């Protein structure tokens, strides 16, 4: 290298920046020692850098290269670029050293920040200098979560001939998608496209399917993880069960059905849904009279099962598996609509959440797909009045759909859940399709119809005479004995009050409740909203800082089915790449500053 | 045919079937059918003893065809096929009669149900006579991949594949790699450096011994089928290369909407109306000036230029909203005293971190003006007393007012559209385009990167508008598909597919366009069509359509289905 | 005993056959008159199958495929959709009542719908009475 | 004609406390939850919109900020924490400054230091004036609080009160007239028959004395507090303006003093409650405090405190000297409070708000009439 | 030169006589044939009486070329008679092979035919309502005419046939080839189709074939056709793809679509159903209404699909 360039390093921060475990002064001190660095400055958040003042300084100090360092230095880059241009310099010589982007959020933030600054000073992309050391890799893969993303990733890997363990928390794979009726915007039936994949998983010789199981502990290192999986007792042998329903028919216990979003009940011995994979029964130990009474009561199913497959002496067991890669595809939970009281969920019987409506309108749902209102009926067993769906129940004459329930709201989830606009439009379509005379209102803020064919779908809904109201509805009240929804129709400049028979709340997506614990077990990060953090938002949306562990689907952030599937496949590429080449990706954390710096130096020289 | 030795097994499924269907009657009936050597009724055919019984019978009674009347074939067909295989006969010599899901579980009249079961069993026996031994076959898989397009999607896929040790030919039309992303400085919503991420990838691609980068190159022709493509590539002005590849990834990206098409925005006519890409360049170069050399004070971003407008493109271009918000941040950074307006329809801030970015842009006092879809803001000259270059008039729908705002620089957020050569590419690699010119994926939900042409994949914005993370994920997904195929070395061809009897084909080409997977090839020299079995998915559409009866679908031959039809009806007519 | 129609059903493997299976798993009862022949896709249903079934004495033929847009093979069901009107006209010219041959879309989750279709079709065919095709063909037969 | 948007207005409104208005993304939640918002006045969203876009003319004629009582529901339900309630509050401050023809109000709102300086100045002048009067011209003695030879004679104070009152009323009257002009007078499209002014005039006292609209809020306590404060203040004003003699008499006139004590306790209690609320920030409408809010509340507590203190000193402890001193100090609070706060700052709303109720009803009637005319003419109603 | 001349008969059932013309169209060849064979019966060309045939010994005839369908009892009688007397029975032409044009009468009932011909026909004098009966009593005694059947049969339906020479009429060269094979004793195994190819007309058609997507069907005269391009692609309903070849592509070559006289391809059971399947498959639309509209351009689908072979179809006849 010739004469060292005169490099200025500016540390800039925004006031609102997240507290990062970075000791800025230490990093600044480190930067001073880097070759070519002529000026280091730690700027306070205010005032914001003024390009003209900066230009003056840069000219005065004769800086040839400017490194802007900080949590999100991109916010300051245009100012520095303009300053360098004003100073007559080369605007391409403004480089970024982004702590946030390059993962200086972990415990060793300061060390990572130093490395990031070093790379910027050398003019080498951080990813290039800090690519983790390859590791040996066990070809087996663990996929956590059996929703569509997990299924896709598992199939993709297994179809390539590699061993996959698929661990699913519930009694069947399928996840949320199995609950859906139609999928937007093509309106194809979710079961039609998902069940063949589920069956393929169930029958795949390379996939070891562990349903009703949870990951308990992960030890080892990238490429060679040892995972403890807790297999909860199903009490029915899934391989031998012929799904004859005999046991279920005699079971006296009824608990809300998870699969039906709680709008119907299931028995204590149950199959989550008819197409479940494995297609076998299991016993909900928390509800089973026999188990709860220690074998003193009931046991009806035990006597009924002709194949004698019910074994109440089954116990949970922990199995240990060894894998090289882990794919996290744990999906999401939906926002609890009870949290927003003004929508009256839980108070008004016909205020439904999206999942409930999905099941209601589903041909395999409790009403055979008929959209009906809940009616009051006396439960013979409990002798109490209950609001239930009855296929013969009254059809709603008017339905309101409220977008952004729990989303885009600083009090609940500040982010956009990304799928609700489209599924709400789908709901409107289904309502109009099944009840052409029903009046349907959509209350929205921004209609986020951004995907392939989405905008056209929105146009179609308008043609179907759905009243699309720009303005999130404010509340559901009882007025003159009728449920009434209130909101502002912004485009028409009116306050609106529609009497409605049914309100559908387009609840947003939230990180699955166990993701906190899982993040701890796996040693991966979550972002401020609780989603798993990827290595790089843009170019590595599936990687994590911990080598060999990948995230796929909604657990990384809300996304629709095509995006989740694409991501799941992308993860498979990562896994297959390491298995095929025999070179796994180690953790970046294992690299020291010195190592990264010397690599950057070498790369810069090359 | 008459000397077939058929075994018929009727499952009671505990009482699931036997409760309604008289299983013994079914097996007794079957025993008398021509060709049936043995018929049994058993409690659980799928259980180990049940399967053992079949295996033993096959061996001892030299059965050559098996009928199992039990549950849905969707449930246990693989189980029984395995049993046949274990017993040493071809697994396709099995036929199942579904007397549970579609009989005992749905009927309560025992007689009617038994009749139906008899008919189904009869049909199965009649059909199984015509079953042929089928074998899974394998064709070679060439490990090399042809990647068309050197943008972020192409680079990503090339790297994934080469990192796994597989050869890649990366064909780029331009004289440099990077594609449209090379024109971008910072990315939304985190304002990370696009330059760094591209520099990283390009460097790795160029240094990879497994990737051959062909710049200024275009694909001339592609022949063959999955695993065995041959591509002719024109390199530079007059070079040519022929490469053999197993897979093709199309990642040809998008082109920006030509803002000149919307005349009243005056792009090309009004000096200070620029496109988003032009503003991007200004920001990247640190020289943000009006045409007259003034530092602009008022910036107006007009969203949805060419997008969400049926006159141009009905679809949303997906990234422009976030890009406009990004410009808001960048302008306020470079010119702290400037004012920024966003004239938008709906704010599409849907990605991770995007809503937050939108909120922060708002907090920076960017003025958001909403106009109605189907209308457009108007750019008018400013008056003599105005301190701005232009005025923008817009019917602002959130206030319901006609308003005008001063503007020095109007930025048109041009949308994405399919490249001008997309139709040629589609034709070359035989994939389809939708009405907007985007390439069509095999299945929008479950197969967003494959196409109906086996072995040809699509990734990135050539499939539909999308941002960087989406393009990267798709590119990697496509790489996964390709790696999956490569890692097995051979491509397994399902034993069930359609085939053309060349002695009967007359080359009428009725079938050619019917196949959604382009599995049917027409050979102009011999004037015959041919089904590429490696690509065929056995739907049977062409079989039904072939007017000369030259195409037969394995395992679903006319013969087999006719026998089945006769089977269900003949029995019924003799009984009822 | 009254007339019990014999109906041949051609069901596509991915949606309709699965839907019919679902009717089973959900124990939705329906008329036992339809005998199902599984094909991979409704596009495989050659009109010849329909005339064959009628000639063999079927009183009705039911063809079921995935809903338009849902086809496992992208657009096979559209091909079924295209063939059906012309086949219908052909059969009409033969003098076969319209209700005897039916094309329906049944998705994998529409077990109930499948049951309803079967019941409805059985009822309609029952009302039409037995198909005369086979009787007439037999009556016409000439001693060679 | 298109209206020119002004990106600077939102920056200006920051001085008046509207710091979060830019965050609003117009979901319409606030207008729909607002118990006061009803057609044809949909707020706060629309006012927020005008403000974001800097439509100054629209805002100036906009009475909606006065229809808002800041119950805080909108701010509580705002998904973007754009604080619509506080924005309305800020708009009231801004409107106050715009109604005020002198420009003093604008100065005060934009600079609390200027306001404080003005208050101190007026206080010092008042103090000096009263001392001069007491020692020089009034002929009274510092040792006499009431009755013959009192340090500050009732008559003189009374005259002073009335002069001050008239000056204030003049200022306020001109500002109110401006308010009318901006909101009704200027708008040629609104036709208001003179009779309507009379017919609706009852609204003025009704709203002044009851703030009954405030009571429509879901939470009743803020209204009760506000009502107590207003009634106490009004009672005190009436006592001072009309019954100062009784108040000042040597013996305790319970008919007057009873009310006096009650009003003072009311004033003290409510303003201390408000201060405490603003410090604790638990209630939405107390979360954000402009500097002028603090000044006003402190002044109020000060005035009420000194008011009662002088009474207590005189009537309970018979400390005439101390009572007189406190009296002067009290006046040093009263005069700036009345002289500056009433026409130029927060206290002006006691006039503007009932007026706004009155004007808005007139406006609404005119708008309804216009719509009826349009409908009758067969022209389509605006969608 | 064989010692004994071959004994052959040519007979027509329900037919137009075109097949006879096709035999004559072999031109000088037919004269040559005369030297090799004795024509024992050929109603169109030579005098002959049924009783002469009845007088023959069984199997006396080496071959009978039977053309025409079986419409009445006379046809059936002669078919059975000639079968008995012949070693080889050849179904010549579409009528004998598949039912042919007369077979289209299977769309209607016997009653309808009689009414149309004898009662409703505009050329019938008013008041003349005479319908022929199988037997009529006249002064001379009982007058019998052949019984008119309910439907038309193929030859194969009433007697076993050894060979089929398709075509309406069969191409003269094919007739020639068949006769030659007969004379030379080089006939293929019995019950096969001779004088035709195993592929369809498209195989021999010189028209250029590309990808087929049709959005409109036309009658041949409705459009100006591209003489080199596949007719089907131009929307002209051509049955060539579903029809055995061997005719020499006479129709498409002269700008008319193939009507299917050679019958189905060897693997095809039902020509019409297959044709319907193929034609509707290439309709380029996914919209049911649009599909209906496009297919609506096709008139009389039963007549189109089975112009020459309705009695040979799976359903054979209208069930009305």
Predicted feature residues:
Chain D
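Flexible metal-binding regulatory segments at protein termini and peripheral loops
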Residues: 1-2, 92, 96, 383
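Ferredoxin-type iron-sulfur electron-transfer modules and their immediate structural context
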Residues: 1-65, 350, 358, 364-365, ...
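Membrane-interfacial loop-to-transmembrane-helix junctions in polytopic alpha-helical membrane proteins
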Residues: 14-20, 61, 153-156, 214-224, ...
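Iron-sulfur-cluster electron-transfer modules
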Residues: 21, 38, 48-245, 249
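Secondary-structure capping and boundary motifs in well-ordered enzyme cores
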Residues: 23-26, 60-63, 67-70, 261-264, ...
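Hydrophobic alpha-helical transmembrane segments of multi-pass small-molecule transporters/permeases
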Residues: 29, 33, 73, 77, ...
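Hydrophobic cores of alpha-helical transmembrane segments in multi-pass integral membrane proteins
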Residues: 91, 117-132, 158-177, 225-245, ...
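Cytosolic juxtamembrane regulatory segments of multi-pass membrane proteins
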Residues: 194-209, 302, 361-383
């Amino acid at each position: 290298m010739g004469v060292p360039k005169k490099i200025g390093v500016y540390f800039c921060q925004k006031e609102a920046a997240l507290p990062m475990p970075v000791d800025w002064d230490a990093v600044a001190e480190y930067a001073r020692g880097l070759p070519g660095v002529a000026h280091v400055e730690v700027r306070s958040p205010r005032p914001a850098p003024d390009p003209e003042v900066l230009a003056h300084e840069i000219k005065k100090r004769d800086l040839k290269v400017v490194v802007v360092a900080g949590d999100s230095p991109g916010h300051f880059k245009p100012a520095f670029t303009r300053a360098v241009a004003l100073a007559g310099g080369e605007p391409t010589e403004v480089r970024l050293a982004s702590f946030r982007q390059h993962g200086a959020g972990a415990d060793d933030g300061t060390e990572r920040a130093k490395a990031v600054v070093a790379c910027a000073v050398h003019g080498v992309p951080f990813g290039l200098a800090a690519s983790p050391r390859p590791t040996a890799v066990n070809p087996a893969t663990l996929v956590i979560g059996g929703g569509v993303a997990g299924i896709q990733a598992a199939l993709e890997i297994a179809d390539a001939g590699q061993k996959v363990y698929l661990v699913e928390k519930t009694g069947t794979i399928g996840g949320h998608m199995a609950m859906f009726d139609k999928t937007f915007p093509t309106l194809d039936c979710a079961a039609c496209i998902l069940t063949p994949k589920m069956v393929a998983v169930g029958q795949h010789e390379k996939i070891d399917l562990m349903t009703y199981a949870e990951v308990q502990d992960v030890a080892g290192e990238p490429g060679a993880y040892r995972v403890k999986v807790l297999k909860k007792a199903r009490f029915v042998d899934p391989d031998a069960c012929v799904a004859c329903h005999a046991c279920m028919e005699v079971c006296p216990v009824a608990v809300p059905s998870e699969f039906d979003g709680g709008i119907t009940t299931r028995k204590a011995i149950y199959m989550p849904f008819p197409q479940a994979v494995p297609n076998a029964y299991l016993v909900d130990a928390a509800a089973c009279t026999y188990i709860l009474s220690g074998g003193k009561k009931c046991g009806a199913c035990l006597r009924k099962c002709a194949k004698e497959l019910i074994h109440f002496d089954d116990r949970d067991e922990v199995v240990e598996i060894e894998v090289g890669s882990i794919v996290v595809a744990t999906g999401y939970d939906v926002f609890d609509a009870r949290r927003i009281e003004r929508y009256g969920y839980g108070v008004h019987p016909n205020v439904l959440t999206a999942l409930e409506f999905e099941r209601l309108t589903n041909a395999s749902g409790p009403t055979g797909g008929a959209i009906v209102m809940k009616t009051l009926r006396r439960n013979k067993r409990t002798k109490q009045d209950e609001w239930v769906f009855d296929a013969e129940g009254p059809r709603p004459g008017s339905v309101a759909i409220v977008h952004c329930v729990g989303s885009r709201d600083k009090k609940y989830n500040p982010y956009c859940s990304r799928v609700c606009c489209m599924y709400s439009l789908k709901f409107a379509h289904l309502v109009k399709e099944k009840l052409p005379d029903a009046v349907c209102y959509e209350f929205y803020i921004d209609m986020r119809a951004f995907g392939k064919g989405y905008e056209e779908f929105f146009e179609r809904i308008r043609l179907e005479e759905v009243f699309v109201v720009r303005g999130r509805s404010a509340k559901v009240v009882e007025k003159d004995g009728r449920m009434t929804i209130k909101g502002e129709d912004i485009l028409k400049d009116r306050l609106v009050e529609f009497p409605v028979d049914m309100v559908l709340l387009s609840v947003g997506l939230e990180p699955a409740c166990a993701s906190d614990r899982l993040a701890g077990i796996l040693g991966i990060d979550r972002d401020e909203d609780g989603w798993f953090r990827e290595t790089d938002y843009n170019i590595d949306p599936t990687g994590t800082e911990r080598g060999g562990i990948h995230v796929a689907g909604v657990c990384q952030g809300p996304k629709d089915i095509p995006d989740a599937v694409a991501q799941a496949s992308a993860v498979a590429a990562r896994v297959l790449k390491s298995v095929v080449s025999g070179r796994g990706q180690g953790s970046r954390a294992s690299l020291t500053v010195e190592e990264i710096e010397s690599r950057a130096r070498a790369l810069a020289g090359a | 045919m008459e000397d077939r030795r058929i075994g018929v097994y009727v499952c009671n499924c505990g009482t699931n079937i036997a409760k309604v269907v008289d299983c013994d009657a079914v097996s007794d009936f079957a025993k008398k059918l021509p060709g049936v050597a043995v018929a049994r009724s058993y409690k659980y055919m799928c259980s180990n003893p049940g399967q053992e019984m079949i295996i033993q019978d096959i061996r001892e009674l030299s059965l050559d065809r098996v009928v199992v009347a039990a549950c849905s074939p969707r449930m246990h067909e693989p189980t029984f096929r395995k049993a046949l295989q274990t017993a040493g006969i071809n697994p396709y010599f099995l036929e199942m009669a579904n007397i549970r899901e579609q009989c005992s579980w749905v009927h309560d009249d025992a007689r009617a149900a038994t009749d139906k079961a008899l008919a189904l069993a009869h049909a199965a026996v009649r059909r199984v006579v015509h079953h042929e031994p089928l074998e899974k076959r394998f064709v070679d898989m060439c490990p090399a991949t042809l990647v068309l397009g050197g943008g972020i999607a192409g680079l990503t896929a090339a790297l994934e594949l080469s990192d796994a040790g597989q050869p890649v030919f990366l064909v780029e039309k331009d004289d440099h790699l990077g594609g449209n992303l090379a024109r971008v400085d910072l990315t939304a919503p985190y304002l990370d450096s696009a330059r760094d991420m591209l520099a990283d990838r390009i460097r790795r691609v160029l240094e990879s011994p497994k990737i051959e980068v062909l710049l200024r190159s275009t694909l001339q022709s592609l022949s063959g089928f999955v695993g065995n493509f041959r591509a002719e590539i024109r390199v530079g002005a007059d070079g040519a290369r022929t490469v053999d590849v197993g897979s093709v990834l199309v990642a040809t990206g998008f082109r920006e909407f030509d803002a000149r098409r919307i005349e009243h925005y005056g792009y090309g006519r009004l000096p200070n109306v620029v496109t988003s890409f032009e503003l991007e360049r200004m920001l990247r170069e640190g020289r943000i000036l009006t045409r007259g050399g003034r530092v602009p004070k008022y910036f107006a971003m007009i969203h949805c230029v060419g997008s969400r407008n049926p006159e141009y493109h009905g679809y949303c271009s997906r990234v422009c909203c976030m890009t406009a918000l990004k410009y808001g941040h960048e302008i306020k950074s470079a010119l702290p005293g400037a004012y920024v307006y966003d004239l938008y329809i709906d704010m599409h801030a849907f990605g991770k971190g995007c809503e937050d970015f939108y909120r922060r842009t708002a907090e920076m006092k960017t003025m958001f003006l909403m106009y109605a879809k189907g209308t457009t803001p108007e750019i008018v000259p400013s008056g003599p007393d105005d301190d701005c270059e232009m005025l923008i008039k817009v019917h602002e729908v959130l206030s319901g007012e006609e308003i005008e705002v001063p503007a020095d620089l109007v930025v048109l957020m041009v949308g994405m559209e399919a490249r001008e050569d997309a139709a040629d590419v589609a034709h070359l690699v035989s994939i389809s385009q939708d009405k907007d010119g985007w390439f069509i994926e095999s299945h929008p939900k479950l197969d967003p990167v494959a196409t109906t042409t086996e072995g040809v994949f699509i990734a990135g914005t050539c499939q539909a508008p999308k941002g960087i993370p989406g393009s990267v994920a798709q590119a990697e997904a496509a790489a996964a598909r390709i790696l999956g195929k490569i890692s097995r070395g051979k491509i397994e061809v399902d034993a069930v597919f359609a085939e053309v009897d060349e002695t009967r084909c007359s080359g009428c080409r009725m079938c050619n366009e019917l196949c959604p997977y382009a599995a049917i090839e027409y050979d102009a020299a011999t004037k015959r069509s041919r089904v590429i079995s490696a690509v065929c998915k056995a739907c049977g559409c062409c079989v039904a359509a072939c007017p000369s009866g030259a195409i037969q679908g394995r395992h679903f031959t006319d013969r087999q289905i006719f026998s089945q039809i006769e089977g269900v009806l003949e029995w019924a007519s003799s009984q009822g | 005993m009254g007339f019990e129609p014999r109906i041949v059903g051609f069901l596509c493997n991915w949606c309709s056959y699965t839907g019919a299976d679902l009717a089973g798993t959900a124990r939705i009862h329906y008329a036992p008159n339809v005998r199902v022949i599984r094909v991979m896709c409704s596009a495989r249903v050659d009109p010849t199958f329909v005339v064959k079934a009628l000639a063999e004495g079927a009183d009705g033929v039911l063809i079921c495929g995935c809903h338009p847009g849902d086809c496992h093979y992208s657009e096979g069901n559209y091909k079924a959709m295209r063939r059906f009107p012309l086949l219908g006209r052909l059969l009409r010219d033969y003098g076969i009542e319209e209700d005897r041959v039916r094309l329906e879309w049944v998705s994998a989750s529409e077990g109930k719908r499948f049951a309803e279709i079967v019941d409805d079709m059985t009822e309609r065919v029952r009302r039409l009475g037995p198909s005369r095709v086979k009787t007439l063909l037999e009556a016409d037969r000439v001693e060679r | 004609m298109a209206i020119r948007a002004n990106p600077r207005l939102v920056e200006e409104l920051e001085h008046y406390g509207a710091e979060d208005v830019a965050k609003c993304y117009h979901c319409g939640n606030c207008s729909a939850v607002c118990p006061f918002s009803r057609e044809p006045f949909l707020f706060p969203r629309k006012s927020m919109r005008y403000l974001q876009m800097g439509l100054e003319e629209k805002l100036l004629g906009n009475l909606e900020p006065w229809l808002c009582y800041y119950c805080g529901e909108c701010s509580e339900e705002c998904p973007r924490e754009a604080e619509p309630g506080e924005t309305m509050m800020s708009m009231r401050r801004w409107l106050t400054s715009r109604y005020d023809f002198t420009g003093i109000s604008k100065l005060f709102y934009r600079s609390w230091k200027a306001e404080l300086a003005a208050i101190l100045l007026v206080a010092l002048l008042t103090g000096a004036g009263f001392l001069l009067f007491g020692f020089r011209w009034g002929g009274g003695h510092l040792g006499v609080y009431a009755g013959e030879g009192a340090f500050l004679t009732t008559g003189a104070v009374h005259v002073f009160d009335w002069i001050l009152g008239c000056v204030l009323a003049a200022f306020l009257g001109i500002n109110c007239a401006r308010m009318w002009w901006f909101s009704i007078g200027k708008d040629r499209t609104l036709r208001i028959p003179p009779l309507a002014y009379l017919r609706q005039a009852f609204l003025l006292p009704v709203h002044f004395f009851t703030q009954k609209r405030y009571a429509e809020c879901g939470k009743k306590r803020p209204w009760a507090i506000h009502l107590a404060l207003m009634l106490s203040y009004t009672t005190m004003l009436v006592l001072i303006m009309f019954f100062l003699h009784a108040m000042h008499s040597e013996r305790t006139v319970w008919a007057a003093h009873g009310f006096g004590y009650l009003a003072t306790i009311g004033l003290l209690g409510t303003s201390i409650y408000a201060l405490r609320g603003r410090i604790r920030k638990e209630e939405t409408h107390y979360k954000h405090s402009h500097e002028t809010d603090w000044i006003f509340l402190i002044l109020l507590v000060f005035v009420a405190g000194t008011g009662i203190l002088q009474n207590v000193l005189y009537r309970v402890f018979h400390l005439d000297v101390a009572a007189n001193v406190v009296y002067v100090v009290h006046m040093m609070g009263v005069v700036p409070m009345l002289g500056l706060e009433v026409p130029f700052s927060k206290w002006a709303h006691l006039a503007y708000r009932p007026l706004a109720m009155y004007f808005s009803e007139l406006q609404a009637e005119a708008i309804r009439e216009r719509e009826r005319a349009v409908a009758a003419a067969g022209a389509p109603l605006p969608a | 030169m064989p010692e004994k001349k071959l004994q052959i008969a040519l007979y027509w059932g329900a037919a137009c006589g075109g097949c006879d013309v096709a035999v004559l169209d072999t031109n000088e060849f037919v004269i040559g044939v005369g030297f090799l064979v004795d024509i024992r019966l050929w109603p169109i060309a030579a005098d002959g009486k049924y009783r002469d045939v009845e007088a023959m010994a069984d199997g006396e005839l080496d071959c009978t070329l039977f053309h025409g369908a079986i419409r009445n009892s006379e046809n059936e009688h002669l078919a059975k008679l000639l079968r008995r007397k012949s070693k080889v029975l050849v179904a010549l032409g579409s009528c004998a092979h598949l039912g042919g044009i007369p077979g289209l009468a299977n769309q209607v009932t016997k009653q309808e035919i009689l009414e149309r011909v004898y009662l409703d026909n505009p050329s019938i004098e008013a008041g003349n309502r005479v319908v022929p009966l199988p037997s009529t009593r006249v002064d001379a005694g009982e007058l019998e005419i052949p019984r008119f059947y309910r439907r038309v049969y193929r030859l194969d339906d009433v007697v076993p046939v050894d060979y089929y020479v398709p075509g309406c009429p069969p191409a003269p060269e094919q007739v020639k080839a068949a006769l030659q094979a007969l004379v030379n004793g080089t006939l293929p195994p019995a019950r096969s189709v001779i004088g035709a190819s195993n592929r369809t007309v498209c195989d021999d058609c010189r028209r250029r074939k590309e990808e087929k997507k049709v959005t409109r069907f036309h009658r041949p005269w409705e459009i100006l056709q591209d003489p080199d391009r596949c007719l089907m692609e131009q929307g002209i309903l051509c049955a060539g793809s579903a029809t055995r070849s061997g005719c020499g592509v006479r129709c498409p070559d002269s700008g008319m679509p193939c009507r299917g006289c050679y019958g189905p391809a060897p693997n095809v059971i039902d020509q019409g159903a297959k044709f319907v399947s193929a034609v509707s498959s290439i309709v380029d639309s996914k919209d049911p209404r649009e599909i209906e509209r496009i297919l609506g351009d096709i008139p009389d689908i039963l007549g189109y699909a089975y112009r020459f072979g309705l009695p040979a179809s799976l359903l054979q006849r209208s069930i009305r």
